[in-house]
């Protein structure tokens, strides 16, 4: 994955569909590399888990929301750049987080923790 700067095997419905489109385009002569930010979701009983990005190379993890309410997000940062987000029962915020990770937004932990900050405003 060019965007992640590594080779990576991912198994998800979305990834399989998008990579098959890339292969078909390559066969047709359009050699655009596959460089989408990976994302996944899973429903586990009454919890919706959603993940975007690859968090393995982070140097900071910041929680937004309350774990006790079982609705929160974990933001994974590397040198203040947002590289991944794990969302628990936070589907609306997750849609914004997908864009934030794709745009490689630089963000401070204080801003992430501040519930008065609208995540949409960080896309500007």
Across the structure, where does each feature detected by a protein language model lie?
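Mid-to-C-terminal Rossmann-like scaffold of FAD/NAD(P)H-dependent oxidoreductases
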Residues: 1-91
């Amino acid at each position: 994955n060019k965007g992640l700067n590594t080779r990576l095997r991912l198994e998800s419905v979305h990834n399989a569909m998008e990579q098959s489109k890339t292969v078909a385009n390559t066969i047709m002569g359009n050699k655009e590399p596959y460089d989408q930010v990976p994302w996944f979701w899973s429903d586990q009983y009454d919890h919706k888990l959603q993940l975007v990005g690859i968090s393995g190379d982070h140097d900071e993890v910041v929680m937004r929301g309350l774990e006790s309410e079982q609705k929160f997000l974990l933001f994974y940062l590397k040198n203040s750049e947002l590289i991944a987000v794990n969302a628990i029962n936070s589907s609306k915020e997750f849609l914004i987080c997908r864009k934030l990770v794709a745009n490689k937004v630089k963000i401070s932990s204080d801003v992430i923790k501040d519930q008065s900050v609208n995540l949409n405003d960080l896309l500007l």
